[in-house]
Every structure is written in C-alpha cells, then in structure tokens.
C-alpha cells in the first residue's frame, strides 16, 4: 500500500492526482475509485493510502483501494 497527499481533485470533472510520499510521479485518481472507497470526494492536502492498478486495455496506472490516512 502506498501513501500520499491529494494534490488536487475536481469532483465536477471526476478526477484528480495524488502526490506520493516517496517522491514518485503523481498518481491519477478517478471519481469511481473514490466512490468505491465510500468517500464523497477528496480534498487538497488530504493524506491517503492507496494501491496502484494498471488498466489492461490502456496500460495507464491509477490509484484504487483508497483510504483516509
């Protein structure tokens, strides 16, 4: 499980980015992952833990299994 800070999240557009604590490249997060976690939204500066999953069709990575830290 990875940890990081929400860089920004736009609930109208349905996505945002998490800045990993380890300094890696920002991680995309989709609104569907937020909903699956039982959260309403994410706020800038919020600490979260997450897994990185790769879409088999597009090959792109995103955050999933979000939890407030």
UniProtKB/Swiss-Prot annotation:
Recorded superkingdom: Bacteria
Keywords, A to Z, come to: Activator, Cytoplasm, DNA-binding, Stress response, Transcription, Transcription regulation
Entry keyword DNA-binding: yes
Q: Which SMART domains match?
A: CSP
GO CC terms on record?
cytosol
Q: Does the keyword Metal-binding apply?
A: no
Q: Which CDD domains did the record assign? A: CSP_CDS
Where would you find this protein in the cell? Cytoplasm
Q: What induces it?
A: By cold shock.
What PANTHER family has UniProt attached to this entry? COLD SHOCK DOMAIN CONTAINING PROTEINS
> What protein am I looking at?
Cold shock protein CspA
């Amino acid at each position: 499980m990875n940890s990081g800070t929400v860089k920004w999240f736009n609930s109208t557009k349905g996505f945002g980015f998490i800045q990993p604590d380890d300094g890696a490249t920002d991680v995309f997060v989709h609104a569907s992952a937020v909903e699956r976690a039982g959260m309403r939204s994410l706020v800038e500066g919020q600490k979260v833990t997450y897994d990185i999953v790769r879409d088999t069709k597009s090959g792109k990575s995103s955050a999933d299994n979000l939890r407030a830290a």
